[in-house]
């Protein structure tokens, strides 16, 4: 490797790191030293890092009693933490310091995404500068920013490019062993994403066969097959218990059938898929364009900052014989047909598009290729992007039926009636129109950038494009993170929960129920809990809850009518933030839990004791 090329590798890593610091630092400063978001990030990522750190250091890495009513430690946490190399970087630090490491680790993940995407893309482009642009687009893509909510998804984004590089090296340069190691790494890091990567790798392999330079012999094919098996075997210590635990959960056995194999239901998912290509990412649980798509947690986001699909569409138009031309339409077809989409999650009926980061990587390469090649006119792709943005934006003005209260002036009586109004269809109007404005602005700025592409020297144009890309990545990422943080907890509220000191002078075995605070708060306090928010538990836990008459999906959150379950589960204490005692739902809970009596107040929390504790 030439010295100048090494410089670009460093640039791919450190420029993304600087941008990551610029992106996350304001949030860290506002929230008192660590990054707070909303939803699953607050309820799972920080508590799980804390619990796993403590468990490993205490030697409790076979069975976790702090997870619901008890769970296989490796099977339950391989999906979230144990396979992540970034989690293991947190192990030298005290468990209570985990919350301060979340933002630095996110920055490191983004930096690695940029580096490894650059390493992949440089194989297919002439200019290293264009590969730098592709690396940034991958690291700060809509998928990447959407899934800050699911912090552990970035690990798959980091290691996936390495497997594609290894495949290329095995076939093109006849290198051995590297593919087996990357298969092992991907399977070890996250078994869920690895299954989808296997499906994509088959599609990728078949498309690459159309390239004369990608020559496959029987020997090479057998080497790939052998190294694939060896790779999975090497990851077996993590992969096998994780798979066994996963298939033991009820949700894993639900599959598609009937018309749902062929057509998405609800039909709004089709609109959501196309919206994800041309607009900044909606955040989880906020589908503003297509609110009835039933895809609140599906990670439907494939937007590339500034360029959108302009580079991809232009590439397909002007490179008719290139292997990548076939890959993207095939991936779109998989996304549009439910049974094909579900193949990435072993045909489960839960709707997810968490495999989008794989075609996004290729889309980043196609965009980088289009930027450096004068024969590709990106204005062609921009026209189609503009058409798509205008068409999808029409959702915002479509007539919809809304309820209106009408007051009779004469009698003063109020009646509710249905009326048809414009501009009422989006779920949340302000984020909707901000997203529209950002998408339109990106098209205009991109047009200004590429209109004089032919007149500029390639290197000068790519340097200009790189600067535009950096600014765009930060702007679109800020939009997503500010939106998510705005609907998160008030500044200081989550800090009070995380840093609370709850001391119960009790040597017996007991569980603590927390109510009105973040899920899994007991993990932050080092206590056994009654409530839990965790997707992967042993099948026996689900059988137990079913026998108790409680239907559990991903959350153990029985209402007050299950007062007997609390005693059976050895729930001895109930902890509630004191200022929430006046809330109506809190009062309802306490009315049902008559066996609980107030015994103490600590650090802004009121503690109740169960007189019927077993």
Task: Identify the residue ranges that each predicted region occupies.
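Start-transfer (signal-anchor) and selected internal transmembrane alpha helices
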Residues: 1-28, 223, 460-468
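Transmembrane alpha-helical segments
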Residues: 113-120, 159-171, 199-207, 308-313, ...
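Soluble catalytic regions of membrane-associated enzymes that act on cell-envelope
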Residues: 91-92, 428-430, 462-614
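Periplasmic/ER-lumenal interhelical loops and adjacent helix-loop junctions
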Residues: 43, 47-52, 78, 85, ...
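Membrane-interface helix-loop-helix junctions at transmembrane boundaries of multi-pass membrane enzymes
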Residues: 214-222, 311-335, 456
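Membrane-interface coil-to-helix junctions
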Residues: 19-114, 136-158, 246-251, 259-303, ...
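Contiguous transmembrane helix-bundle modules in multi-pass membrane proteins
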Residues: 174, 193, 323-497
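Membrane-embedded helix bundles of polyisoprenyl
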Residues: 16-20, 110-123, 129-210, 223-243, ...
């Amino acid at each position: 490797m030439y010295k100048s090329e090494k410089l670009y590798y460093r640039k791919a890593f450190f420029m993304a790191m600087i941008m990551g610091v610029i992106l996350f630092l304001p949030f860290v400063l506002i929230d008192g030293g660590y990054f707070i978001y909303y939803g699953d990030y607050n309820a799972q990522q920080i508590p799980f890092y804390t619990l796993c750190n403590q468990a490993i250091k205490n030697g409790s890495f076979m069975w976790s009693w702090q997870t619901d009513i008890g769970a296989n430690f490796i099977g339950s946490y391989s999906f979230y933490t144990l396979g992540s190399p970034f989690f293991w970087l947190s192990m030298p630090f005290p468990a209570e310091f985990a919350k301060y490491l979340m933002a630095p680790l996110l920055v490191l993940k983004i930096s690695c995404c940029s580096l490894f995407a650059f390493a992949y893309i440089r194989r297919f482009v002439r200019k290293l500068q264009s590969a730098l642009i592709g690396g940034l687009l991958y690291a700060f893509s809509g998928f990447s920013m959407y899934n800050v909510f699911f912090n552990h998804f970035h690990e798959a984004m980091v290691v996936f490019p390495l497997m594609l590089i290894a495949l290329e090296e095995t076939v093109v340069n006849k290198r051995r062993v590297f593919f087996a190691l990357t298969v092992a790494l991907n399977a070890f890091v996250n078994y869920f994403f690895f299954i989808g990567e296997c499906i994509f790798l088959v599609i990728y392999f078949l498309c690459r066969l159309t390239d004369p330079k990608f020559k496959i012999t029987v020997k090479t094919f057998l080497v790939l097959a052998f190294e694939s098996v060896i790779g999975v075997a090497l990851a077996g210590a993590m992969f096998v218990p994780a798979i066994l635990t996963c298939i033991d959960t009820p949700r894993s056995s639900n599959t598609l059938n009937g018309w749902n194999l062929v057509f998405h239901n609800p039909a709004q998912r089709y609109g959501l898929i196309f919206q994800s290509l041309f607009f900044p990412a909606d955040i989880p649980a906020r589908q503003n364009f297509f609110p009835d798509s039933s895809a609140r947690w599906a990670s439907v986001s494939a937007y590339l900052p500034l360029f959108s699909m302009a580079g991809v569409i232009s590439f397909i138009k002007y490179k008719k014989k290139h292997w990548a031309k076939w890959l993207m339409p095939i991936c779109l077809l998989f996304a549009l047909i439910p049974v094909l989409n579900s193949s990435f999650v072993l045909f489960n009926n839960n709707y997810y598009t968490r495999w989008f980061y794989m075609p996004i990587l290729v889309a980043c390469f196609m965009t980088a290729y289009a930027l450096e090649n004068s024969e590709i006119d990106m204005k062609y792709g921009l026209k189609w992007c503009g058409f798509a943005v205008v068409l999808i934006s029409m959702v915002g003005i479509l007539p919809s039926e809304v309820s209106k209260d009408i007051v009779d002036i004469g009698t003063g009586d109020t009646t509710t009636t249905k009326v048809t109004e414009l501009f009422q269809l989006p779920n949340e109007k302000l984020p909707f129109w901000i997203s529209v404005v950002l998408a339109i602005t990106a098209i205009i700025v991109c047009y200004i950038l590429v209109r004089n592409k032919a007149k500029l020297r390639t290197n000068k144009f790519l340097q200009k494009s790189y600067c535009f890309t950096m600014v765009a990545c930060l702007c679109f990422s800020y939009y997503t993170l500010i939106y998510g943080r705005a609907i998160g907890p008030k500044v200081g509220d989550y800090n009070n929960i995380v840093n609370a000191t709850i001391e119960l002078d009790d040597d017996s075995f007991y569980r603590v129920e927390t109510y009105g605070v973040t899920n899994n708060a007991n993990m932050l306090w080092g206590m056994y809990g009654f409530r839990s928010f965790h997707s992967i538990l042993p099948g026996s836990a689900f059988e137990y809850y079913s026998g108790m008459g409680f239907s559990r999906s991903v959350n153990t959150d029985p209402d007050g009518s299950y007062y007997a379950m609390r005693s059976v589960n050895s729930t001895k204490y109930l902890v509630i933030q004191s200022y929430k005692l006046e809330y109506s739902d809190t009062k309802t809970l306490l009315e049902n839990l008559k066996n609980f009596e107030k015994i103490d107040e600590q650090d802004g929390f009121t503690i109740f004791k169960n007189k019927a504790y077993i």
